[in-house]
């Protein structure tokens, strides 16, 4: 391999694309592309019991949707494949046997019952479980005999019990661990497949990975990974361990707890660009005031040394704000195209949806807010006459009734029902009555919508509703106000 930067995203196909996983993929992609490097997709499927049908498609689809295009991977191949761990079984066994020859690993024939007993003892003593090296000194004859008899075995890493192991992480700095704390972790399981802990080290080396990006929960395993690199005489890659993403101060974001996955956020009407932009800022500080970044700007600005150690809190309000910024930056045509499925779901009347898009474009932060903004277009909602009283607009029951009674015949006489003509009629009435705009416009808006807050005002709503429906609703408003007399 050359000195080219090479990063990898190595998910397990176990279901949804969690926000934390997507951030790992994004950071790995940005590190590679910042230096014109390669971004590799590797599928880590050695834990066969956790695999979920269709999860592989979720991984491919997410990378495709987000534009985090990999340069090598199972679907497109590359020079260091296969890129699926279950297809690399023989490679891991070969390297595990090399460790045995070097005296850095050993066969373990301990039964499940014995290991369960050791675990129970550790729990009773409130100590972390560590294998007791029971099989470390078996002779070659004993090992050969047990293998010949078909006794199940695993291959374990042989860690020292004295001294310490140190490693450097770009975010957390230099970390040193007493070797007495290192468990002789399993490298090859009894089914012949490697553990994640072994496979990721072998694959990262053979695939020429220069920067390993992963969650900070792997910090505690890194000394054992380093001992594997040293045992093989391999260079240790640059470690970039990212802080956890928290739901709040005390709870990690977790799909198991019903927290949003990438698919959930997309289904709620968040734009992929906004999601990526927001996730990039969960733990990374670009410096300065700028918060909205295109992918090209992220690639240029991203420096992994500016990732914080402190956990990042997933702030839905901040994500909504950012999504609103992205929605407002869309062209009207693009927004209309994205809003159409929501109109089809929410509207029961045949209305000019392009005009509705003109109203909503700057008024929604998330696309799934659209239906709740449209309810009054289908049917006039039941509302209290008290809505006609508005202190700021200086409206009362009396002047509201007068405004509606005065505007009704003028709108009835209107032959060409357009926004401009409706506006002209209403503004002429304001002059004629010598009142503030709100005295005429607030009652009309209340009558046609039945709501305190609407996208657009009286003219826009009347234009979209059409003449017949608008007049009908104004008459209902007049009746409501007359009933109070």
From Swiss-Prot:
GO terms for cellular component: cytosol. It comes from the Bacteria. It comes from Clostridium botulinum (strain Hall / ATCC 3502 / NCTC 13319 / Type A). Its EC number is 6.1.1.17. It is found in: Cytoplasm. This is Glutamate--tRNA ligase. Belongs to the class-I aminoacyl-tRNA synthetase family. Glutamate--tRNA ligase type 1 subfamily. It catalyses: tRNA(Glu) + L-glutamate + ATP = L-glutamyl-tRNA(Glu) + AMP + diphosphate. ATP binds at residue 255. Coiled coil: none annotated. GO terms for molecular function: ATP binding; glutamate-tRNA ligase activity; glutamine-tRNA ligase activity; tRNA binding; zinc ion binding. Zn(2+) binds at residues 108, 110, 135, 137. NCBIfam families: gltX_bact. Monomer. Its main location: cytoplasm. The keyword Transmembrane does not apply. The gene is gltX.
